[in-house]
Amino acid sequence: IKMGYEVAVVGCGNIGLMAIAWAKAFGAKRVFAIDIDDAQLQLAKEFGADVLINSTDIDFHDEIRKYGNGVDLAIESAGNPFTAARVLGLPHKGGEVVYMGIPYADVPIPRFYFERIMRNELHVIGSWCTISAPYPGKEWTNAVEYIGSGKVDVLGMVTHQVNLSEGPEMF
């Protein structure tokens, strides 16, 4: 994410909320939050989203196009086969798509969306949070710095506090 980017985040669960917070911390000009749950969209606003789109009734592709020719970066964090295909239609020519959500079903990609990769010369990237090589990796250094300084606020994700012994019941 570069200063001034326009970013779309599809799926506003924990991964999406953090993607929104990081986008704003890195200087995104406008962040679109896309979800089917109004409560999650309100959380997305608290994490810095500028435009909230409930895709239950609105085509998020058409809605984003009202603001220009597409975003610089589209992040798929829902892990939904439907959105995994549709996210390819959000970036402008030369834009990026990052897949962070993990689908638990096959992802059929209609020809229109698959062609967006070639016709728009998209950069498609997968992201997986794990330890990098060589051990110890440095991927958490920035996270600790940004969270510790308050540039990225994670406290909004805390909705309940329970005793450790109650943990198994929560799941």
Question: What feature does the model see in each segment?
Answer:
Residues 63-74:
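A short acidic, Gly/Pro-enriched loop at the edge of an enzyme's catalytic core
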Residues 77-85:
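Beta-loop-alpha module in the N-terminal Rossmann-like domain of NAD(P)-dependent dehydrogenases
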Residues 100-101:
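Acidic carboxylate diad motif detector
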Residues 107-160, 168-169:
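C-terminal substrate-binding/catalytic core of Rossmann-like NAD(P)-dependent dehydrogenases/reductases
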Residues 91-93:
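Helix-to-beta-strand junctions that scaffold the AdoMet/dcAdoMet cofactor pocket
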Residues 1-57, 62:
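Mid-domain Rossmann-like dinucleotide-binding core that forms the NAD(H)/NADP(H) cofactor-binding site
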Residues 51-56, 159-166:
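Short acidic-hydrophobic, aromatic-tinged amphipathic segments that line or gate anion-handling sites
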